[in-house]
Amino acid sequence: MATINQLVNNPRKRSVVKSKVPALKACPQRRGVCTRVYTTTPKKPNSALRKVARVRLTSGFEVTSYIGGEGHNLQEHSVVLIRGGRVKDLPGVRYHIVRGALDTSGVNNRKHGRSKYGTKRPKS
């Protein structure tokens, strides 16, 4: 336990929490332009072709973000909205593209969890 004199001379330091999504600059989402849309493979033990896009943000950062859902309409120069949220089996992918916002279409024929994929309610 520190004495009062020790604390007067050298106060306790607050631990600094490092942001997991620095490119968002403390905003919930950011707009950006796709510079490259491609597929990549996950870490072991998983196997797939994951769809990702390289995005240049309005904050000046260029980040890799994941395109969730089945099928997408993104190509180079598409304007997208990104949110935080990493993909555990893709190293360096710390952001998600928001489906159904700006140039990104929602997922077709999706019945459950529609709000996460920008899908409108089906006609009964």
Curated annotation (Swiss-Prot):
It comes from the Bacteria. Residues 109-124 have a biased composition (Basic residues). GO terms for cellular component: small ribosomal subunit. It holds the Pfam family Ribosom_S12_S23. Residues 102-124 are annotated as: Disordered. Gene3D superfamilies: Nucleic acid-binding proteins (2.40.50.140). Keywords: Methylation, Ribonucleoprotein, Ribosomal protein, RNA-binding, rRNA-binding, tRNA-binding. GO terms for biological process: translation. GO terms for molecular function: rRNA binding; structural constituent of ribosome; tRNA binding. With S4 and S5 plays an important role in translational accuracy. Belongs to the universal ribosomal protein uS12 family. Part of the 30S ribosomal subunit. Contacts proteins S8 and S17. May interact with IF1 in the 30S initiation complex. This is Small ribosomal subunit protein uS12. It comes from Francisella tularensis subsp. novicida (strain U112).
